[in-house]
Every structure is written in C-alpha cells, then in structure tokens.
C-alpha cells in the first residue's frame, strides 16, 4: 500500500489558502502518499503565483494550463498521476489522516470498491459537522451528497472517461462523475468519521450552484449512460409532488405510514440541511 495515493489539487487564485491545504497534507503524511500534484488553472493573482513558485522549489509537481475550469484541471493532474488511487482536494480545504491511513486499505481489500468517502467538518463562515449518509443510488440521483474530496481508484476515472470538461455551468462536475461511476457498477464505501475540513467562504460557489438547476439537470441526464437515472429522478419528483398534494388535502398525519415506506424503499430523500449544495468548485467560470 506504500506510494499508492496521488493527491490532485486544482488551484486558481487561492494562494493563501493553498499554503494551508499543503500544510494539512504534510501534517498527516503517511507512507501511502506517493505525490502531490498542483494544477494551476491560469492563476493571475501575484500572491498565488509566488506560492506556486515556492511549492515548485519544494519539489511539489506544479502543472500550469490556461484557465479551462476545474474539471479540466483535475483531469490534467490525474492523467499524469502515478498513484493507483486518487484523492482530489480543493485548494481551500484541509485533509485529515483517515483518507491516507484507512482509505488505501479498504480499496486493496475489495476490488469492487471504487470510491471511499467520509464526513467533513465545516470551518470558516460556517461550523459544525457535515454528516454524509451511507451510499444509496436513489438518494444520489435525487441530489448530490458527495464532495469531490473522496478517495477513488484511477481505474474509476479511466472507466468513466474523466470529469466532464464541457459543463454549461461549473460546480456540477462531482455529481456527474459519481453518477457515471455508480452506473458502471463501482461500489462506494462510507467512512463514518471526519476525513477532511470543508471551508465555507464568501465568493465560493457554495451559494451559486443551485441557480442553474434546470439547465444542468437537462444537460447531465440527457447523457446516454444517465438517461435511465434521469427518468428515475423525474418519477421520484413526480411522486414527491403527489405526496405534497395529498399532505395538503389530507393532513400530514394520515400519510406517515406512506412516508415511512418510501424511506425504507428509497433510503429517504436528501435534505438541504445535510449539505446545502450539490458540489462546489474554487475555479471560476471559463470565458469562452
């Protein structure tokens, strides 16, 4: 399991936070960590450029490309990664030891497992624990509950063809990636402990993603491999509307047994309070 993990960090103008991210990696470094790859996605901020130069001098692999978006930046880093397992980390977050200490063991133990993910701790403009549910495809089809910071086999990335670099809007790459991995039969395993720290800050895409729901739903679920999931999602939403209408007409108490049955069958719907966005990126929209 030594030298099995490649950490890939897309970076755009967040040099101050990037130092903190790197420090968190060094603080939990284990023999499983093979390399740290930083992909500069066309940064223009002088501080960030200076930080990147310093990291390069410290023997980190720094790749540079014109601003093409977070999906392209991740793909560029993963493409050259030598590790069997990939851990994408946003350049304003911090990781904990669990991913490097326990993740590779789980993946080595069971070849059918493609993705290992865990809970997160919010910091910055929000605090508290983000408790991620056990994996359930119906729940994932309804709404994303997995951040990009999850350990997965490089073979998963190869199998799905990488992150979509042509999203009409940024911030949805993770959900699309996880769905395409799931429909190909890869198993997801949940570590029930905090595996990384998730920064909530002004100016991130945390509050922007949901504005593009309709456009992105149409784009993602028109993909050939996701059409069936799109039909499932539409039916789930239709049933939800029926449930809400019946609750209005009959009262919530009468429908408690029905809601309990739906929860048992589908794993329950993802609530906004669990995690308010589908995913988020620290890379700006690319100007075409």
Residue ranges and their predicted role:
Residues 211-288:
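Boundary detector for helix-to-coil junctions that initiate low-complexity/charged tails
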Residues 86:
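Short aromatic/hydrophobic "clamp" motif used to bind/position activated sugar donors
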Residues 65-81:
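Glycine-rich, basic loop-to-helix element that forms the pyrophosphate-binding segment
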Residues 23-33:
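Short, acidic, metal-binding catalytic loop of nucleotide-sugar glycosyltransferases
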Residues 40-49, 90:
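A conserved acidic beta->alpha catalytic loop
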Residues 98-130:
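Conserved donor NDP-sugar-binding/catalytic core segment of glycosyltransferases
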Residues 169-177:
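Acidic donor-binding loop at a coil-to-helix junction in glycosyltransferase catalytic cores
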Residues 33-42, 63-66:
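Short beta-strand/loop segment that forms part of the nucleotide-sugar
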């Amino acid at each position: 399991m030594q030298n099995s993990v490649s950490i890939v960090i897309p970076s755009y103008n967040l040099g101050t936070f990037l130092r903190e991210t790197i420090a968190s990696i060094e603080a939990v470094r284990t023999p499983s960590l093979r390399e740290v790859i930083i992909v500069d996605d066309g940064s223009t901020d002088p501080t960030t450029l200076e930080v990147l130069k310093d990291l390069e001098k410290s023997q980190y692999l720094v790749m540079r490309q014109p601003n093409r978006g977070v999906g392209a930046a991740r793909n560029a880093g993963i493409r050259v990664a030598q590790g069997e397992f990939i851990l994408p980390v946003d350049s304003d977050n911090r990781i904990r030891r669990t991913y490097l200490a326990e993740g590779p063991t789980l993946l080595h133990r069971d070849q059918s497992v493609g993705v290992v993910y865990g809970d997160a701790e919010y910091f910055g403009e929000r605090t508290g624990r983000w408790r991620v549910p056990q994996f359930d495809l119906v729940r994932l089809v309804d709404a994303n509950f997995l951040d990009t910071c999850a350990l997965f086999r490089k073979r998963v990335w190869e199998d799905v063809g990488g992150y979509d670099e042509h999203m009409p809007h940024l911030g949805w790459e993770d959900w699309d990636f996880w769905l395409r991995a799931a429909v190909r039969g890869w198993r997801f395993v949940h570590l029930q402990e905090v595996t990384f720290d998730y920064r909530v800050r002004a100016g991130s895409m945390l509050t922007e993603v949901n504005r593009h729901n309709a456009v992105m739903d149409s784009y993602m679920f028109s993909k050939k491999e996701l059409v069936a999931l799109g039909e499932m999602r539409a039916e789930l939403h239709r049933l939800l509307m029926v449930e809400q209408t019946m609750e209005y007409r009959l009262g919530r108490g009468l429908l408690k047994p029905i809601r309990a049955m739906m929860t048992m069958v589908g794993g329950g719907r993802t609530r906004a309070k669990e995690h308010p966005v589908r995913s988020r990126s620290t890379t700006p929209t690319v100007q075409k």
